[in-house]
Each structure stands twice: as C-alpha cells, then as structure tokens.
UniProtKB/Swiss-Prot annotation:
Protein name, as recorded: Interferon
Domain of life of the native organism: Eukaryota
GO biological process entries: defense response to virus; immune response
Signal peptide: 1-30
GO cellular component terms, A-Z: extracellular space
Length: 192
C-alpha cells in the first residue's frame, strides 16, 4: 500500500505565493519608469524632428498623399496593446530615419539625438513588453501591426521611387511628425 505524501506545510504555500507576488510586483514596477518619460517623449521628439529637418531649400510640389494611413486602427484603451503598437511604430521610424540616404540639409547631430531618444524609449517599451509577456499570454490582433508595416513599406518605396529627393524626404518628415502625434495619442489614451 502506498504511503500518502506528507501534507505540504501551509508556510510552503505562503512562500510560493509571496514569490509569485514579488515577481509580479517587480514586473509592474519595471513599467512604471515609462510614465514620466511618456509625458515628454512626443513633445521632445517633435522638437528634435523640427530642429533636424528644416524645410527643403526649394519648394516641393504637392504629392498625391502617398501612403495614406487609416489611424482608426490605432484606437485602443489597452495599455499593453498601445505599448506594442508604439514599439512597432518606433522601430519603423528608427529604421527609416537612420538610413544613409537622408538629405544633406538635415542636421545630423539633431537626427542622432532623435534616433537616440527613439531607441531609448523603444528599449524601455521592449523591457515592459517582455515583463508583461511573462505574466500574460494574451495574443493581440495583428491587423494594426500589418497596417503599420504596409504603411512604412509604402514610405520606403516612395523614397526609392523619388530617388530619395529632398522633397520625398520632406514628405517622410511630415509622416514622422504624424506618427509621433499618434504615439502621443496612444500614450495619453492609455496612461490617463
């Protein structure tokens, strides 16, 4: 006859519960560092974008709004969804603005400052997303991310088709400004 296992001491459950609670608390605290940065990221980034990319030396013809974007796909009140979407946008902005074909009239030191700011914020979001991923296995819809990916692919094609001209880059600068405003709205809607 098998001997029943000795009952687990209640303190053992308490230690396990305390360990799980501490891990969840540490993960939640890891995301708190975003809040002060949330308040200034968009404003500071918009200022750096304005400083780095003055208008082109010659007036640009009006483009037929290439790469339009339906921003209603960004509507969410879920903080994790907003963080994931913001992270995706920041990765694309970093990739497009860090390319070697940026116009000569852009101020490189300001561009580097903007890229550093984007990278720091993306890294903070990445850490927060990694921490929240260990707590939650919820899958988020891919539609907003596919739409964002298509939009940035269109911007890359637009630059290529226009030989990376100063006017094409000016259009990209205006789109980058719009994306930073989208990020501001995402953060404001989920952090207030």
């Amino acid at each position: 006859m098998a001997v029943p296992a000795s009952p687990q001491h209640p303190r053992g459950y308490g230690i396990l519960l305390l360990t799980l609670l501490m891990k969840a608390l540490a993960a939640a605290a890891a995301c708190n560092h975003l809040r002060p940065q949330d308040a200034t990221f968009s404003r500071d980034s918009l200022q750096l974008l304005r400083d780095m990319a003055p208008s082109p030396p010659q007036p640009c013809p009006q483009h037929n709004a290439p790469c339009s974007f339906n921003d209603t796909v960004l509507d969410t009140n879920n903080t994790q969804q907003a963080d994931k979407t913001t992270h995706n946008i920041l990765q694309h902005l970093f990739k497009i603005l860090s390319g070697p074909t940026t116009p000569a009239h852009w101020i490189d030191s300001q561009r580097q400052s903007l890229l550093n700011q984007i990278q720091r914020y993306a890294q903070h979001l990445e850490q927060c997303l990694a921490d929240s991923h260990t707590r939650s296995r919820t899958r988020w819809p891919h539609n907003p991310h596919l739409t964002i990916n298509k939009h940035f692919s269109c911007l890359h094609a637009f630059l290529h088709d226009n030989d990376y001209s100063a006017c094409a880059w000016d259009h990209v600068r205006l789109r980058a400004r719009a994306w930073l405003l989208h990020i501001h709205d995402l953060v404001r809607n989920t952090r207030t």
